[in-house]
Regions:
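M16/MPP (pitrilysin/insulinase) zinc-metallopeptidase core fold and M16-derived inactive scaffolds
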Residues: 58-126, 172, 187-192
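Acidic/histidine-enriched alpha-helical segments
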Residues: 97-99, 148-168, 227, 246-260
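M16/insulysin-pitrilysin zinc metalloprotease superfamily fold
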Residues: 87-91, 125-159, 287-289
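An aromatic/glycine/proline-enriched structural segment found at the starts
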Residues: 188, 219-284
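Scaffold signal of the M16-like zinc-metallopeptidase fold and its non-catalytic homologs
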Residues: 138, 145, 166-215, 235
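Solvent-exposed, polar/charged alpha-helical surfaces in well-ordered, non-transmembrane soluble domains
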Residues: 75, 83, 98-99, 103, ...
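Extracytoplasmic
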Residues: 30-33, 39-42, 52-62, 72-77, ...
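Gram-negative bacterial Sec-dependent N-terminal signal peptides
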Residues: 1-23
């Protein structure tokens, strides 16, 4: 009986030791995930997925700027700049640029071509697989939008007359709960969906673009069945020539703590009454786990 107890005790200690070892083991990065930074500060990440050859190639360009950094006179600039970019060819022939955007939306899971929030702007392209030519065109277009965009009275008027395809995050910045959540926040009064003030100050819009759209504040992400080395070379060739450097830090979004009292919010967007239990949370989760 005593021997049995000793064996059980020994086994339990071994199990505890094993569990402790497993919990202490550091997560290893995926070797298929490549990343780098160009000489101008432009960051890129590429995840090759040869095990999923039929998946579309997902391309995202994130710019660390949003409506929170706008002054009163600049209200609407952060939303309008992607809108203006989407009306331009980005150095591509007109029909070629049009074909690129027609093919860059996933019919099964469509995303808006651009999203603007309080502290970031995001361009989204979803390309058909095995189309390296389209990927090259997409990178070329993004590089043009990132630092070579034409900002003239004619270009601005053309963009204002066209459809606004830029979405915001949150999707509805006027929604009752979100307006309640913004009370006491630094984000209040900096609506990413704010319309552009008329008449447009072209010089001020151009200065805003060149001040905030700098390569050291951009991150490009490519995921799909691609050749990582070839894509990295293409990124260096396409984005390496972008100029500019951030001289002013961006404003940091913050939310005030939620009060621990119930609240009733009326909205026309919900047809049936609902009861929600909310946990307090920061504006965004931690994005870098390394």
């Amino acid at each position: 009986m005593q021997g049995t107890k000793i064996r059980l005790l020994t086994g339990g200690l071994l199990m505890l030791a094993t569990v402790g070892y497993v919990q202490a083991e550091a997560l290893q990065p995926d070797p298929a995930w490549q990343q780098g930074t160009l000489a101008n500060g432009f960051q890129w990440q590429v995840l090759a997925t040869p095990q999923r050859p039929s998946d579309r190639i997902e391309v995202r360009l994130s710019v660390n700027i949003g409506s929170l950094s706008e002054s009163t006179q600049q209200s609407g600039f952060s939303h309008f700049i992607p809108r203006l970019a989407l009306t331009q060819n980005g150095g591509l022939p007109t029909m070629q640029a049009r074909s690129l955007w027609q093919q860059s939306i996933d019919p099964k899971r469509p995303l808006p071509p651009a999203i603007v929030s309080y502290d970031y702007s995001l361009f989204n392209l979803s390309l058909p697989n095995n189309r390296n030519d389209l990927l090259k065109e997409a990178l070329s277009w993004l590089a043009s939008a990132s630092g070579k965009m034409s900002i003239t009275p004619e270009a601005v008027n053309h963009a204002l007359q066209g459809e606004d395809m830029v979405a915001t995050w949150p999707a509805d910045t006027k929604e009752g709960w979100w307006r309640y959540r913004l009370k006491g926040s630094t984000m209040l009064g900096h609506d990413p969906a704010a319309p552009l003030k008329q008449p447009v100050d072209i010089a001020q819009l151009k200065d805003y673009y060149h001040k905030w759209y700098t390569p050291d504040a951009m991150t490009l992400i490519v995921v799909g069945n691609v050749d990582s080395r070839s894509v990295a070379e293409q990124i260096n060739k396409t984005f390496g020539g972008l100029k500019g450097k951030r001289e002013t830090p961006v404003a940091v979004p913050t939310l005030s703590p939620l009060p621990t009292t119930p609240v009733s919010i009326m909205t026309d967007a919900v047809r049936q009454d609902k009861l929600s239990l909310m946990w307090d949370a920061p504006w965004q989760p931690i994005r870098d786990s390394v």
